Structures are given as structure tokens and as C-alpha cells.
Amino acid sequence: MAYKPEGYTDISPYLLVADIAATLDFLEAAFGATRLRLHHRPNGDPMHAEARIGDSVVMLGQAPGGDGAHVHIYVPDVRATYAAALKAGATSVQEPLDQGDGDLRAGVQDSQGTIWWPSTQLSVR
């Protein structure tokens, strides 16, 4: 069985964060992201970045305070991803839990305030 529902992509958000560099570091450590692009403002501050996670790209914009977004991401092993995210500096929102909706899901909050919901499909809905 696939680790995600047929036709789903892993992730496709645009996040506004206070610190693009810190978010990219977290995405690499927690989810194995690969940096794709980084654009700067005329004063040299980061303006926009892109990173690939699995089969998808997450885009980041730098904005003071960020937006506190929530992102759902399908992963092959939610327990391993949860552990990697905590090791990368995230705080736990929810330990991996099967709530009967077909997914095993955990929740972590990164240093920029984004809450990530890594999930692995347990059964076809």
C-alpha cells in the first residue's frame, strides 16, 4: 500500500516566516529537503526561497513575525519523521497518533511558529 492517497502530492504551501534561513535548515534536518532557489531583496535580506520535499516544492517568503501556518505532509514513516523534527529543534504538538481517519499523524512546531503535521496512510479511505 502507498504511504499517501493516490493523486496527492506531499506538500504544496507558500509559508511566510520570520527567518528563511532557519526554516530552510529545519526543513533539511526534519524532512530531508533540498534547497532549490534563494532570492534576495535589494538590501541583501532573503525575500523568497524554494525547497523540494519528496515530490513537492515548498515556497518561503520572509515576513516579520511569520504567519503561524499549519502544513500537512505525507511521509513514508511518521515516527521517524517526528523524531527527526524533534532532533532538529521542533517542539511536540502531538505524538504519532491513529485517530481512526486512516492516517497515523503527529504534530510538531518549528522555531518560526509553523506547525507541521507529518502523516502516513494506514488504510485507504
Language-model segments: which ranges?
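Short amphipathic alpha-helices within nucleic acid-binding modules
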Residues: D25-F26, R79-A84
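Short, solvent-exposed beta-strand edge segments and adjacent coil->beta transition regions
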Residues: Y8-S12, G66-H70
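A short beta-turn/loop motif at secondary-structure boundaries
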Residues: R41-G44, G65, Q99-G100
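Short hydrophobic/aromatic beta-strand micro-patches
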Residues: Y14-L16, H72-P76
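Vicinal oxygen chelate
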Residues: M1-E6, L36, M47, M59, ...
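Core segments of cupin and vicinal oxygen chelate
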Residues: Y3-Y8, Y14-V57
